[in-house]
Regions:
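Catalytic-core helical/loop segments in enzymes performing group transfer/polymerization on anionic/lipid-linked
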Residues: 1-628
């Protein structure tokens, strides 16, 4: 669990252990924050004495931005697990005459420096009795701590108050603590939430935050000689003694950067919080591990079914791309999932893990018969200046790094066009692809498109680039283009061709979007998502368009707002900036042979086997099935 921590902690320390930020189990991903403290001994007393000494030395020299950092810590609900909704549970937000008293439950065996299980059970019983005695008319809430531990919950060995209510674990505890009047805990990390929200914290154990004069302590707190402020304590524990992983570079970073990352996780969960129960229909086994983190964006449960008739009440149906929804009962909500526009360093059909995917509640973005979530974003969102600036910077970096959807490698063209000739690139597409079936009218094949382009540009130097999925043999769509094009390029990479082209003519290929990002003239003959906004020359009228867009607005909608990005190392959601950083180096490799490569089928077999194994492990770990 601490491999990254130990690799990054270069100082000579005696103890390294996980901090309390964004807790998760070992199988869920690497630790993101850890303590690195020179302890005289690996004991609770030594830990407290280190804090005390640091407070005595630095209490008058707290960094000026600690208060702002603490506020961000609370807003991000930094001590809650990744998929918690960062809002107060509805019942606590309602006006009532009764006091709300929160009791935090913990595991019998707690963290590194907690007392033994017997002592902790006794402390919990004492805590329960004290809370009932002090607040006989209160409404009690029991919430389970997210801190790692083993054994039964302490509440299992204790008689609970009559009418006690159980906290809904879908919500972040940090967002609800400000709405209670008292918090009772033995030693849960979430007790810090009470202190940071000015809620009285009643402590019956010896956590690091107790004993400094800011908590109501019901037992001896040895080793505390200082009386520091909450800001000073926070600074010592989470800034001075803690180390944090930078989620973009995967190197040592700052708490501020980690809080940005946690805020992103909260935003994703909030965006997809309605997807609490998802049934994915007819997904191939090799795709399941790749789709899992995206379909789990709402933090609920996910199961795989073979037919739409197997859906249960309250479930969302999930379909891949434009797959047929036949058999789905009326009224069942549905989402569609598809590869994002910054996908990977290999073909999706070669079973390469996707760095981004899109989840659309309305319909596939490549189906012009109906609006999609992307269409709605591009029509209706008032992109603020900072977001447009971010989009411009992202676009510039994508262009600088030569990135596209699949990033198979780079190879410049070897042909040379005659001087003063307009170079027109015609990217091929997969003949049976949904974007062709749904997104074309009249001209529906690459051959017909080449005929049309030659008619429109009789004197141009036309370059035809077959689709890599077709060259690989994974999909159909080979055409005899030699009689219509001046060059049929099967060796160069797409971005190198776009860079030398003057114009790009396409049915609905994503290459048109790549060309727009690079300032090229783009002519469309189908109905792609990027057409119809005033940025392209379109042969067809584009439906569902309400306004014109700038290139930065299109980029903001298509690359910032619409997709989900996933870090397969950290196993958390990430940003497009982080994804392009990881794609950059492998994307620079020399483009290998795609067509006729004899070892490609072997690699596909290995990947299929690996993905099927991962999916089987995931099923076992999560005990697949509805949890209601």
């Amino acid at each position: 669990m601490l491999q990254i921590a130990r690799r990054l902690s270069r100082t000579n320390v005696d103890a390294v252990w996980p901090s309390f930020i964004l807790p998760r189990k070992r199988r869920e991903g690497p630790v993101l924050s850890w303590f690195s403290v020179p302890l005289a001994a690996l004991t609770a007393r030594a830990w407290i004495e280190s804090i005390d000494a640091a407070l005595a030395a630095s209490s008058s020299d707290v960094l000026p931005d600690v208060s702002a950092l603490m506020q961000r810590f609370v807003v991000a609900c930094a001590l809650d697990p990744v998929h918690r909704i960062p809002r107060c549970i509805p019942e606590l937000g309602r006006a009532t005459d009764k006091q709300h008293v929160l009791l935090i439950d913990e595991r019998a065996s707690g963290g590194r420096f907690d007392a033994d299980p017997k002592a902790r059970r006794a402390s919990f019983q004492q805590m329960m009795a004290a809370a009932v005695s002090a607040h006989p008319d209160a409404e009690f809430w029991l919430a389970r701590s997210s801190a790692p531990g083993r054994g039964p919950w302490l509440s299992c060995a204790c008689e609970l108050p009559a009418g006690i209510r159980h906290f809904d674990s879908a919500y972040a505890l940090g967002a609800s603590v400000p709405h209670v009047q008292h918090v009772y805990t033995v030693a849960a990390p979430e007790g810090l939430y009470a202190m940071m929200s000015d809620t009285p914290a009643h402590v019956f154990g010896t956590p690091y935050y107790a004993g400094w004069g800011m908590t109501d302590d019901h037992c001896s707190q040895p080793g505390r000689r200082s009386r520091a402020s909450l800001a000073a304590l926070f600074h010592v524990v989470f800034v001075r003694f803690a180390r944090h992983l930078d989620p973009v570079t995967h190197e040592l970073g700052t708490l501020d950067a980690l809080l940005d990352f946690i805020a992103l996780q909260r935003a994703v969960t909030t965006r997809y919080e309605d997807l609490r129960h998802v049934a994915a229909i007819r997904f191939q086994w090799w795709k399941r591990p790749f789709a899992t983190p995206y379909l789990n964006a709402g933090g609920g449960d996910l199961r795989w079914v073979g037919n739409a008739s197997e859906l249960l009440a309250g479930e969302h149906a999930a379909l891949w791309g434009a797959r047929n929804a036949e058999g789905l009962r009326d009224g069942i909500p549905m989402v569609r999932i598809e590869d994002g526009f910054l996908h990977s360093t290999g073909l999706g059909s070669d079973m390469i893990a996707p760095q981004s995917q899109v989840i659309d509640r309305r319909g596939p973005y490549f189906d012009p018969a109906r609006p999609s979530d992307l269409t709605a974003l591009l029509n209706d969102v008032d992109f603020p200046p900072f977001e447009l600036a971010r989009a411009a910077a992202l676009r510039a970096e994508i262009v600088r790094l030569g990135l596209t959807k699949y990033n198979l490698g780079r190879r410049a063209p070897t042909w040379r066009a005659p001087a003063n000739k307009c170079i027109v690139l015609v990217p091929g597409q997969v003949a049976d692809d949904a974007s062709i079936r749904l997104g074309t009218r009249g001209i529906t094949t690459s051959e017909a498109l080449l005929h049309e382009v030659r008619t429109r540009r009789p004197d141009a130097f036309i370059v035809y680039k077959p689709h890599p999925d077709v060259l690989s043999g994974n999909r159909v769509g080979l055409v005899n283009a030699a009689r219509l094009a001046d060059a049929v390029d099967v060796d160069s990479d797409l971005i190198s061709l776009i860079e030398v082209a003057d114009e790009v003519h396409t049915l609905s290929s994503l290459a048109g979007f790549d060309a727009l990002l690079r300032g090229k003239s783009v002519f469309t003959y189908g109905l792609p998502f990027y057409a119809g906004w005033g940025l392209t020359h379109d042969a067809l009228e584009q439906p569902w368009r309400k306004r014109t867009l700038s290139l930065d607005m299109l980029t903001a909608g298509a690359l910032l707002r619409y997709p989900l990005y996933w870090d397969w190392t950290l196993r958390l959601y990430t940003t497009p900036e982080a994804v392009i950083r990881r794609l950059a180096e492998p994307a620079r490799r020399s483009l290998g042979k795609i067509r006729g490569n004899p070892i490609r089928p072997m690699f596909k077999i290995v990947r299929w086997t690996r993905n099927a194994f991962r999916h089987a492990v995931w099923q076992i770990e999560t005990k697949q099935g509805p949890k209601r």
